[in-house]
């Protein structure tokens, strides 16, 4: 497995390749990331992954400086699984050699709701770095996890609207045996918080079942789920039922025509903010 740190080296090694499968990450890899790489290998060759902690997507009170940098450990994990041909691990100067004044701004109705409401500028930072990485790597396919559902939808829409020659492939959320979605931030949970954390997924499962059983009062369903989380010590940002294809709130016609829906939630347990979702 090759490790490169500059865009020039990346392009030199990949010259002539037209079936590249790409998995962008911020490092601190876990089994969920490795599953994305395994799926990428089924859809292209060679598999390239990036490790870059992108400052643009962190807010002023978020954990950019605290975010774990574990490059050597990450390399060892990927080398063990042998799914990845090349790791692109640039530093900040390589990705942003000058102030990034040109940025990608998602539409308000997609980028300023849910995560975008509570993390202003987050998706602008995500889209900007993803566009830059796609320009550097030039993949045929790129794999993203459904755990970051809104991010997946926004990146997919960006690639479609810019007519980028890349297919965005989604991987199902990888979970621990008790249902907790794997996340680099899970390491911040205390023993007691880790025992409580699966409640988020369990509540989404109950919400899903109630919709399948015919309940249609979206606001009441959301409020009840949020209240139940709060009763167990969570600080809830949102529990929201949305249409899958555009993340808008479903109306009566959507239920009648059985439009695919998704339940999404974000809440903080102790000092750790967790997100999850479940398709319906």
UniProtKB/Swiss-Prot annotation:
The lineage of its organism: Bacteria, Pseudomonadati, Pseudomonadota, Betaproteobacteria, Burkholderiales. Keywords: ATP-binding, Cytoplasm, Ligase, Nucleotide-binding, Pantothenate biosynthesis. Beta-alanine binds at residue 57. The keyword Transmembrane helix does not apply. Its main location: cytoplasm. Coiled coil: none annotated. Catalyzes the condensation of pantoate with beta-alanine in an ATP-dependent reaction via a pantoyl-adenylate intermediate. It comes from Bordetella avium (strain 197N). Its EC number is 6.3.2.1. This is Pantothenate synthetase.
């Amino acid at each position: 497995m090759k490790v490169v740190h500059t865009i020039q080296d990346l392009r030199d090694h990949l010259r002539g390749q037209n079936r590249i499968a790409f998995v962008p990450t911020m490092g601190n890899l876990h089994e969920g990331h490795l599953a994305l790489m395994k799926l990428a290998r089924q859809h292209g060759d060679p598999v390239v992954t990036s490790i870059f902690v992108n400052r643009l997507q962190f807010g002023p009170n978020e954990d950019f400086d605290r975010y774990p940098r574990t490059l050597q450990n990450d390399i060892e994990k990927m080398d063990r699984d042998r799914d990845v041909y090349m790791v692109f691990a640039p530093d900040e100067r390589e990705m942003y050699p000058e102030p990034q004044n040109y940025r990608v701004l998602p539409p308000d109705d997609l980028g300023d709701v849910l995560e975008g409401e509570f993390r202003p500028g987050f998706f602008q930072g995500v889209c900007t770095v993803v566009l830059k990485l796609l320009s550097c790597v030039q993949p045929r396919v790129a794999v993203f996890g459904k755990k970051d559902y809104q991010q997946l939808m926004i990146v997919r829409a960006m690639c479609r609207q810019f007519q980028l020659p890349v297919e965005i492939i989604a991987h199902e959320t990888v979970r621990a045996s008790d249902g907790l979605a794997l996340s680099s931030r899970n390491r911040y949970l205390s023993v007691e918080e880790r025992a409580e954390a699966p409640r988020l997924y369990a509540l989404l499962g109950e919400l899903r079942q109630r919709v399948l059983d015919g309940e249609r009062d979206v606001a009441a369903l959301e409020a009840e789920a949020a209240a139940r989380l709060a009763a167990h010590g969570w600080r809830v940002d949102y529990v929201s039922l949305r249409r899958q294809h555009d993340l808008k709130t479903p109306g009566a016609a959507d239920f009648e025509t059985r439009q695919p829906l998704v339940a999404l939630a974000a809440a903080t347990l102790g000092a750790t903010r967790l997100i999850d979702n479940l398709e319906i």
